Amino acid sequence: MVTPSLRRRALALGGTGLALGLGGCAADDPPAATPQAPGAGSATPTNSVLTPWLSITGGWRTDLQAPPQATRPSGARLNFLQPVGVAAQGDVLLVADAAARTLWRVDRGRDTMAAFAQFTGGGAEQGASLQVGNDFSTWIALPAEHMVVQYDGRGRIVRRWRDEANAPRPVAVAVPEDRRELLVGDAGTAQVVVFDPLGRTLRLLGGRRDPVLQSIGAMCFGPRGLYVLDRMAQQVVVLGPAGEVLEIIGENQLVQPRGLAVDRSGRVFVGDDMDQRIKVFRGAQLLASAGGAGGGPGRFGRIEALAIDGNLLYVADSVNARVQVMLVAPPSMERPGAAP
């Protein structure tokens, strides 16, 4: 079910494009803890960036073999059970459901969904990393199977990427728009493995010889390079083409970072498992903090993964069994000094 709220705000922002062209990023499961946030007791940043809009809980069953933009309902109503990953391209979403062990293709505009592929990559309290291209090709990291799989728009396997020596537990995948390479983040080695389109390993970033990462939970391409969520270091690290560190984001402002997305303007969206809030950064500045624990609009049970497309941020929430859609304000509407 798609539940609308604040549609006037949606129309006002609907023409604003901030698309990065990436399907989404997810976070590997952090260790259970209940620490206090850095600077606890200080003022909470004003949210001038994110507004709750829709809540997607499922859709009407449809035929997967129909073109993504021409689907029609053909069966019963389906609901998500435990969505742990999300990617988006226009009205089409790919949602990884850990409890249903299914990768769903959802048409947001038509309120339909179809089983796209079997999903074996995530379990309880573990996010999934997937990305969808403009031709609806989909890449997904499957740590339990030690590989990344690419599907075509009809859910057929195109290729598998595997390097068990350097990437025994792949938890994040990022593909640039030209698709000349495929980058895989590994939770076991805390390094990024760069593959060519045929599946051959080209090089390693942030690896054992020159460690710049303590862990990898999620990653995305953005304006400055490759953005990597390092959950153990409680920050986002931006890497250049050779693996050099270009920028550190969220230092001393994140506790249990989980889920990552970056828009074209360079704003970085990070889900924090400590307080179930989405924190928005521009460089080192915390622009906004939205959400909190709960089941109402704009509240989250557990933020598993984030994906941004246009002026919409998609949030996979496993506990509330839904994908929330947040309106993203254009950079011109950011209020200076919103964050302390």
Label each region the model flagged:
Residues 76-89, 121-134, 164-178, 210-224, ...:
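Beta-rich, blade/repeat-based domains predominating
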Residues 26-29:
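Bacterial signal peptide processing site
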Residues 93-95, 137-140, 181-184, 226-228, ...:
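Conserved beta-propeller blade signature
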Residues 107-111, 152-156, 196-200, 240-244, ...:
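Short loop/turn segments that connect beta-strands within beta-propeller blades
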Residues 98, 143, 187, 231, ...:
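Short loop/turn segments immediately following the C-termini of beta-strands
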Residues 68-76, 112-120, 157-163, 201-209, ...:
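A short beta-strand motif characteristic of beta-propeller blades
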Residues 1-17:
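N-terminal secretory signal peptides and thylakoid transit peptides that target proteins
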Residues 301-340:
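Blade-level signature of beta-propeller repeat domains, shared across WD40, Kelch, NHL, RCC1
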